[in-house]
């Protein structure tokens, strides 16, 4: 029994030690910005790659390169869909092919599912989401979903098809923990938590994120 308790204690401490803090960013950022964020203790960055206007973010390639040059080990990008553009199968490939053209070094593409720009028809929203997934899969992207219960349910209703992909959820309670998480959309376990917004210590705006390893 004592060995078992020691093992559990070790796992708990090891998990805490190996948790990661990071940022998500929606504006151009320099090497100095990322070096500052590393000095603040952040270890990963998720950078906007596609805007809700239906265009690739012109800053994404440079920001990814600057993050890598600064020494950020884990760099992803996120895609903010444009529902009114009506071309879900094309949006993911537009981003991925753009990044590939510049040999951008990144990991995942997170679909940002939020805002009031979606249709009031949940069936149409689900079809659009599935089009986004299909487009990203056609170019071999590693896909994740950013959302929250308060955003997902009004947009997608009871749809659970997104739950096969990792979940990055938002709850600005300021706590680096998944203890607040309640299942929704078919997800029972999240991958990343966005736990606060409003960071600006390094001259660039960012949100605070966390995940255990």
UniProtKB/Swiss-Prot annotation:
Family matches, as InterPro entries: GH25_Enzymes (IPR051595), Glyco_hydro_25 (IPR002053), Glycoside_hydrolase_SF (IPR017853)
Active-site residues annotated for this sequence: 24, 112, 114
One Pfam assignment: Glyco_hydro_25
Catalytic activity line of the entry: Hydrolysis of (1->4)-beta-linkages between N-acetylmuramic acid and N-acetyl-D-glucosamine residues in a peptidoglycan and between N-acetyl-D-glucosamine residues in chitodextrins
One BP annotation, GO: peptidoglycan catabolic process
Enzyme class, UniProt record, top EC level: hydrolase
UniProt main location, coarse: secreted
The keyword Signal is annotated on this UniProt entry: yes
E.C. designation(s): 3.2.1.17
GO molecular function: lysozyme activity
Residues annotated as signal peptide: 1-19
PANTHER family associated with the record: LYSOZYME PROTEIN (PTHR23208), LYSOZYME-RELATED (PTHR23208:SF36)
Family: Belongs to the glycosyl hydrolase 25 family.
UniProt name for this protein: Probable GH family 25 lysozyme 4
Originating species: Dictyostelium discoideum (Social amoeba)
